[in-house]
Amino acid sequence: MTAVPGMAEQGAGAPGGGAAAAGDEAIRDRVRTYYGATLSSSADLRTSACCDATAVPAALRPLLTRIHPQVLERYYGCGLVAPEQLQGLRVLDLGCGAGRDVYLLAQLVGAGGEVVGVDMTEAQLAVAETWRGWHAEQFGFANVRFLRGEIEQLHALDLEPGSFDLVVSNCVVNLSTDKAAVLAGVRRLLRPGGELYFSDVYCDRRVPEPLRHDPVLYGECLSGALYWNDFLRLARRSGFADPRLVSDRPLAVTDPELAARTGALRFFSATYRLFNIEALEDACEDHGQAVAYRGTVPGAAEALVFDKHHCFDTGRITPVCGNTWLMLRESRLAGHFDFHGDFSRHFGLFPGCGGSLPFSPAAGPAAGPAAAGSGCC
């Protein structure tokens, strides 16, 4: 089989023994320096890639006011990683930085849940740890801890396999030198039916090799970004058979110098959800199944947005593919739906499944769900 230049290197640590390992470590050192010393706040960023421009939902705004300002000002995320129905969950945040998302999620999981943050940058973790006791007083409970480590080496941390309900990450996976190892580690830690819900940066094509070694473009979350279709391939190879796009927005490279370097490359911030369910197929198949949302998820009494192509109205029986049926049936959302049908019959490919660029190219608000029944992907 003929190898495709650029595909493997963007997904996994490059082969080559000691030299490749040294190169990966050099990249990690540059990332540590960029986020530990070069940047002192989100105002120092030179693009919109690692700074979320999307509106925070009204229900979450009061929770952000309970997070310390020194934590908030060191936030470099590119999306929102707070999915529905989090009460009592055990959550892992990859590349947690100074801890904004950890402290936000800590309030959502409540005293009966736990949030663990992992980061390799000592300066960022120092900020997170400094205010851990302060946040426990604010919330009335202590349910947070932080670990120093690399997200490619999750097996080296004191984390029990199959012990997490949810893994999140916010504009960090693109900075990894071995994205395949990250996904493998996540799958190992998720319980059956658990979910990886993460926002990251993607490109409309493979980033040229010279740009992938540019320290500023890498630190700004651009040159480490995967071509979107390579990400889908990598996710499927890692056991996440059907990645679901939740929302996306185009990114603006407004710095003239960086814009000149990136040229025609188009970058997007996108949020995906990936479920750890063995029975998922590699395509959306039609088994004549349907679901009806009960309207019982807090904050979603009228409808529940599941991904970019699924918005479930309360009480409406909605035809779905076998994968969507399983994602709802085998996950924490099962109690909020009524399920119709099974897998005893097959009617072919579910209508609307395609393979074109999934992101919305026009600038503006983050792209939300399409009309119900418009297909799965």
Stretch-by-stretch model annotation:
Residues C51-R90, L104, L108:
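Conserved alpha-helix/loop element of class I SAM-dependent methyltransferases that forms part
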Residues L86-L94, A98-A156:
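Class I SAM-dependent methyltransferase SAM/SAH-binding core
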Residues Y202-L222:
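Short, glycine-/aromatic-enriched active-site segment of Class I SAM-dependent methyltransferases
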Residues S238, R244-R249, D255-C377:
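C-terminal lobe and adjacent flexible extensions of AdoMet/dcAdoMet transferase-like proteins
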